[in-house]
């Protein structure tokens, strides 16, 4: 029966074609490895380029040779005879194999996604309930008398407590200077000077950080009337990048029940930029990439990465 099914097929050529396919894949892999590694260390630029071109040409010749050999063997394999149909066994390929159907993995992924969605929805609901605002004065009606009184939240903290928290954080980091002001009432604004590297304007609402603007050490952070400029961006792209990362850090450090811990964690993360222009990237080992230093700091380890290397 096996001999009858093999009529018209050159099994030896078929076996050689399989080995040739493996050799072709290896040759193509060597081509991409050559492109990935680039020019190797040589005495001169010309020698590096000459060695790279020579190696690349050799790898392309190997690919061309294996491809020609595969085309030659494909003509020798032949076609199976059609005089021996597979009958009902030919329908086996139409039925899905239950062991290879990714139904369980897809259901498990959907279940995890549903649980995560429910968890984050609960967190968002709790945060929105804590920071709820009165949208209209018409709420002071008959129904308002039946509503229970709103419990005080962490948004209503005394200014003395906020000053004490900021003062303790200022003493924690000698290379960081924090100036606190309240130009618009009870809301605090911080001017954080990190060594001679950068300055950060932090807009706060009680102990919650609403906005951060990072500028260079020599840039002007005040408006014409002497107030902190909370709207103008930095003139330098590197500090614009750090501003974007600081905004991401505000979304990462979220603990409404302990806002002082959030502020301290954010200041600890911000302090890691003291070596903004001195620390190399932990992945590529370079100081500059596209003309910029490593502007990203890991939230857990505080290690420096380029924006493209952290992914």
From Swiss-Prot:
GO terms for cellular component: mediator complex. It is found in: Nucleus. Its main location: nucleus. Keywords: Activator, Nucleus, Transcription, Transcription regulation. Belongs to the Mediator complex subunit 27 family. Component of the Mediator complex, a coactivator involved in the regulated transcription of nearly all RNA polymerase II-dependent genes. Mediator functions as a bridge to convey information from gene-specific regulatory proteins to the basal RNA polymerase II transcription machinery. Mediator is recruited to promoters by direct interactions with regulatory proteins and serves as a scaffold for the assembly of a functional preinitiation complex with RNA polymerase II and the general transcription factors. Component of the Mediator complex. This is Mediator of RNA polymerase II transcription subunit 27. It comes from Xenopus tropicalis.
């Amino acid at each position: 029966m096996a001999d009858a099914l093999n009529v018209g097929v050159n099994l030896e050529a078929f076996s050689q074609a399989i080995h040739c396919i493996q050799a072709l894949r290896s040759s193509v892999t060597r081509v991409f490895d050559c492109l990935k590694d680039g020019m190797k260390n040589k005495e001169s630029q010309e020698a590096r380029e000459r060695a790279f071109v020579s190696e690349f040409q050799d790898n392309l010749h190997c690919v061309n040779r294996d491809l020609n050999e595969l085309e030659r063997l494909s003509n020798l394999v032949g076609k199976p005879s059609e005089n021996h149909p597979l009958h009902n066994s030919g329908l086996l390929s139409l039925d899905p194999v239950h062991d290879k159907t990714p139904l369980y993995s897809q259901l498990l992924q959907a279940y995890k996604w549903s649980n995560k969605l429910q968890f984050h929805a609960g967190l968002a609901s709790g945060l929105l309930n804590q920071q709820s605002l009165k949208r209209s004065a018409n709420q002071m009606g008959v129904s308002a008398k039946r509503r229970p009184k709103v419990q005080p939240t962490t948004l209503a903290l005394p200014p003395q407590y906020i000053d004490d928290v900021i003062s303790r954080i200022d003493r924690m980091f000698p290379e960081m200077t924090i100036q606190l002001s309240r130009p618009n009432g009870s809301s605090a604004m911080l001017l954080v000077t990190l060594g001679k590297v950068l300055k950060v304007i932090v807009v706060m609402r009680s102990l919650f950080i609403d906005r951060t603007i990072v500028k260079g050490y020599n840039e002007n952070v005040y408006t014409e009337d002497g107030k902190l400029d909370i709207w103008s961006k930095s003139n330098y792209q590197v500090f614009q990048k750090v501003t974007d990362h600081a905004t991401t850090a505000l979304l990462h450090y979220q603990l409404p029940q302990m806002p002082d811990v959030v502020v301290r964690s954010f200041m600890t993360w911000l302090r890691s930029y003291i070596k903004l222009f001195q620390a190399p990237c932990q992945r590529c080992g370079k100081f500059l990439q596209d003309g910029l230093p490593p502007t990203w700091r890991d939230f857990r380890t505080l290690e420096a990465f380029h924006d493209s290397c952290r992914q």
